Amino acid sequence: MSNMEQDRWSRVKGRLRSSVGEDVYSSWFARMDLESVHDESVHLSVPTRFLKSWIQTHYSDKVLSCWQAELPEVNRVDLTVRSPVRCAAPAKEAPAPVESRRDEQRPSAERSNGATPVSANHDALGGSPLDPRLTFASFVVGRSNTLAHAAAKQVAEGRRGDPVMFNPLYIHSGVGLGKTHLLQAVTWAGNAGTERKVLYLTAEKFMYGFVAALKTQTSLAFKEALRGIDVLVIDDLQFLQGKTTQAEFCHTLNALIDAGRQVVVAADRPPADLESLDERVRSRLAGGLVVEMAPLGEDLRLGILRSRVVAARTHHASFDVPQPVLEYLARTITHNGRDLEGAINRLLAHSKLNNQPVTLEMAEHEVRDLIRPSEPKRIKIEDIQRIVARQYNVSRSDLLSSRRTANVVRPRQVAMYLAKTLTLRSLPEIGRRFGGRDHTTVLHAVRKIEGLVSKDTTLSDEVESLKRQLQE
């Protein structure tokens, strides 16, 4: 891809991100690549059929309009599925780019030597491809991911017959913070010996496998194969759809846990927030060890950048990024690890294709679209309940209870009001999180507090104080 096409593609992605929002973009478009632009058509690719189908069904017009804003003559956007190349084992001599997903785009200079490497992963059982770069050796540990890394390492080092400590192990975080890296590291390490069978599946792969088994009347064999696994690793659980598929996943989860087998799951939110999942599944997932991977701190971002430079030198020995440039990138690119990976890839491509050393001026120009304004803090209902309970000297269990004494009712109403105004949760979801109340109770509480804060200055000050505490 030429520099002009790269710039054009960056502008189109920027329009698309602005149009659909960061969450939607990260979920559906982050792994979409530009293959070519020819006359009036654009050729894009994604790594899975599921992504292709979803984007074509829900966003094809939006993608086309973003391209037409850049190139008015474009009248067609073709979307295809990239075919990964399989290989046998992780490349031990090459440290992986940390925090990157398995389908991360690589610079054109690297792609010329082959597609992103992936590995066979119990193909007979329909395992998802593995990236040999995503191992424990290449994972950079920092304060935000220490617990998740330690728990994953403990799971990976277990032996058949050992007591299972964390079951299921549930890891959640925003996109690009290293969940997939840890899950694939568990799979690589677990399969390094011959003692245990470890299977890595994305949620969409689980869905496709189960639906295909139903169509071919081989569902019994599918179930037996899954339940014969020692460690089942499921990624991107938020994409698990369909009542029948969710029921089968729940049965598999129960069967494995009851048999003392290990289950490891990752998603982009905690179990309680997976509103599309059956309550039984959420409850079982919440019963294990739930670990959040927090956003990357500056020190960890710097470590990731250094690791990526070391990895790039495996194929480009002369590649170097000066320390001031690394510090600039770590300070300004704060969103996730994929953006850090992309920044190093851009500098590598620009340096090699133009035969120029990396400078701070070059970096400022090449990564300008990766520097995003600070995003508001994501506030959780649990945080609201905790801070409101502390403010009014009641317990969180009081807020969730059926008690109707005055010293509990008002704090509960304030907490519901804050949940409605500071989060994107629906009224039924807020009610469920407050002891199973219905949406009319929440609506009454919201209207009650809205009416009071306009008249009662003491209450108004209390509510503003709570908002400040939650947003700090």
From Swiss-Prot:
Keyword terms of this UniProt record: ATP-binding, Cytoplasm, DNA replication, DNA-binding, Lipid-binding, Nucleotide-binding
Annotated S-S bridges: none
Regions of compositional bias (Basic and acidic residues) in chain numbering: 99-109
Major localization listed first in the record, in broad terms: cytoplasm
GO cellular component: cytoplasm; plasma membrane
Gene Ontology terms describing biological process: DNA replication initiation; regulation of DNA replication
Annotated stretches, region: Domain IV, binds dsDNA: 352-472
Region (Domain II): 73-128
Location of the region described as Domain I, interacts with DnaA modulators in the Swiss-Prot/TrEMBL record: 1-73
Compositional bias segments (type: Polar residues): 110-119
Function field: Plays an essential role in the initiation and regulation of chromosomal replication. ATP-DnaA binds to the origin of replication (oriC) to initiate formation of the DNA replication initiation complex once per cell cycle. Binds the DnaA box (a 9 base pair repeat at the origin) and separates the double-stranded (ds)DNA. Forms a right-handed helical filament on oriC DNA; dsDNA binds to the exterior of the filament while single-stranded (ss)DNA is stabiized in the filament's interior.
HAMAP family, alphabetized: DnaA_bact
Family to which the UniProt record says this protein belongs: Belongs to the DnaA family.
Protein name: Chromosomal replication initiator protein DnaA
Species for this entry: Rhodopseudomonas palustris (strain TIE-1)
Organism lineage string: Bacteria, Pseudomonadati, Pseudomonadota, Alphaproteobacteria, Hyphomicrobiales
Gene: dnaA
